Amino acid sequence: MALVVQKYGGSSVADAERIRRVAERIVATKKQGNDVVVVVSAMGDTTDDLLDLAQQVCPAPPPRELDMLLTAGERISNALVAMAIESLGAHARSFTGSQAGVITTGTHGNAKIIDVTPGRLQTALEEGRVVLVAGFQGVSQDTKDVTTLGRGGSDTTAVAMAAALGADVCEIYTDVDGIFSADPRIVRNARKLDTVTFEEMLEMAACGAKVLMLRCVEYARRHNIPVHVRSSYSDRPGTVVVGSIKDVPMEDPILTGVAHDRSEAKVTIVGLPDIPGYAAKVFRAVADADVNIDMVLQNVSKVEDGKTDITFTCSRDVGPAAVEKLDSLRNEIGFSQLLYDDHIGKVSLIGAGMRSHPGVTATFCEALAAVGVNIELISTSEIRISVLCRDTELDKAVVALHEAFGLGGDEEATVYAGTGR
């Protein structure tokens, strides 16, 4: 008997018909002799609707009360799926995040999981029940208030449950058949990948691939939990995220895929003194504004005045906060100008094979040049190349790179509904 954790996204439980279909899949898994724990997201666009409602009532909702409101969405879908399972003759019990033992930090809106104490879940499993856990939420270790986990929170909840319960696999159900070599909404012949290493998936998630969120993959790698990405609309096998690039033969010409991200902004600090300590002042200011940095580029110092420019990218949502913080410290830090650009896109090529194939970067740049895409910034890791371009050219760049590296499959990819979340 295996212990299986399943997670269903909002599009998978968007209405009564889809909820019943999900319940049938869960019951079928249970009848195969498995113990089953299910994590569900809020139905459809419920979270966005609740956010809109909150802002109509209060333009700046108190974070604690906003978390109380938003967690209601997952509790609703959780209970409805449990009812649907009961209607099919199986026994189910639903739990909120706090009832499931999800202990978090106290940061409302973006709490981190500290621990999971799943005693009540284990008791329910021993009673032969299907266990349902409301995703995206927990309880603060210090204040005992309800908290939300931020973007990708339900995925992270599912992997955390799998780790705490010692599950054999964590299945993430979405609206595509697995992880593809590119977004099938942009590249029609994107190829489904059978397996992806944790490192490759981390790079893909960090570069904008939306099927799995970065925090979820980090948690799975840390606890060595295999993650099986599947469609809730078909019985196709999906993609398994497992293992390390250390297990991939160095000489294998493996390129995993092309990822893209249109949610970033670019900040450039112009005329910064090129002496020790000034870059540190810039990034300390950004950190104090609670802004995570992605790509960084420092220009060669201008000999005539000893000044340099530093460019970094961050989420478009927090870009204005970074600019405001830096601008308030302009005289203290000593730069002359601040530039902000939120009309950029990031396109990335990921794959363990580029560790031993020196021509990859040249082909990458040639493919973009051939379709008239200008590279504004470039960043690399052992298994990734990322560049910035205009957001209007992003789709064109994705298609060009996918074709240049021969990543396409023989079949047209199927997208069943929604956005993959």
Curated annotation (Swiss-Prot):
It holds the Pfam family ACT. GO terms for molecular function: aspartate kinase activity; ATP binding. It is an enzyme of class 2 (transferase). The keyword RNA-binding does not apply. The record marks 7, 74 as: Contribution to the catalysis. Residues 267-348, 349-421 form the ACT domain. Substrate binds at residues 25-30, 45-49, 74, 125-126, 151-154, 274, 292-294, 298, 360-361, 374-375, 381-382. Signal peptide: none annotated. One of its GO terms (cellular component) is plasma membrane. Heterotetramer consisting of 2 isoforms Alpha (catalytic and regulation) and of a homodimer of 2 isoforms Beta (regulation). NCBIfam families: asp_kin_monofn, asp_kinases, PRK06635.1-1, PRK06635.1-2, PRK06635.1-4. Catalyzes the phosphorylation of the beta-carboxyl group of aspartic acid with ATP to yield 4-phospho-L-aspartate, which is involved in the branched biosynthetic pathway leading to the biosynthesis of amino acids lysine, threonine, isoleucine and methionine. This is Aspartokinase.
